[in-house]
Amino acid sequence: MRAHFGGSSRKSLVASRVSLDAAVKGADANSASALSSELFFVADVLSTNIAVRRALTDPSRDGKAKAAFISDLLGKKIGALALGLVTELSSLRWSSPKDLVLVVEQLAIEAEASAANIAGELDRVEDEIFTAATAFAGSSELRKALTSDATNAKAILVADILKGASGSTVKLVSQMVNAWRGRSIESAFADYQWALAARRNRLIALVRIAAPLSQAQLDRLTTSLTSKVGQPVRINIEIDPSVLGGVSVKFADEMVDGSVSNRLAGAARALAGSK
């Protein structure tokens, strides 16, 4: 789980996810999946090269020098979007160089989750990952096979076990079994499930309103929020008589507030602050 991140890395994770939001906004499923693949590649590079990790997380190193280093190292191997994200991450502060690896990996998982969401398959992917986690953790033979160094054999095994699963599921599990990063099977699956859930929560809007919406109103709201996010969103409606008018929308970590009650409360706070 990502809850172990320290202060600097925790703040940088938040900023990194905002950058990913912008990167996948309006993207199609193929583009989001391609970004995911490139970020997984970067995570592997960072994981296997401590000198690169330190170079990108050294707070005393000039930002322009880091950007030039990243361009020289990765410019011909990944696209401009992924390159820009990695450059942004290098400008943030990290409690530990290893945290950068984990955050890049999380962004890769979330980018693939975005691809699945765009394709209408995120629910399916989450279910399949949960099922795979249960199956793999419960079989000593599978555990032994998947933690071996035989990369090709693991790829064949995963493809066979996940036959009929979503392409995103196969991709995520294949990536995971070839990059345990010192984790147990249970911990690795927990990290992947956490990242999938984090992206899912980013795409859920809680709407508080005094009276039920008509289907036409709900459709307009869905269209509006989808346009704002640049991806399909799920809307959960909560009827709250205390909302005097308009609508209050909690989306991700942001409030989009059009309710009379909250506008009045906001005005009252502003008046109180001006005294």
Place the predicted regions along the sequence by residue:
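Elongated, mostly alpha-helical coiled-coil "stalk/stator" tethers of large membrane protein machines
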Residues: 1-244, 248-250, 254, 259-275
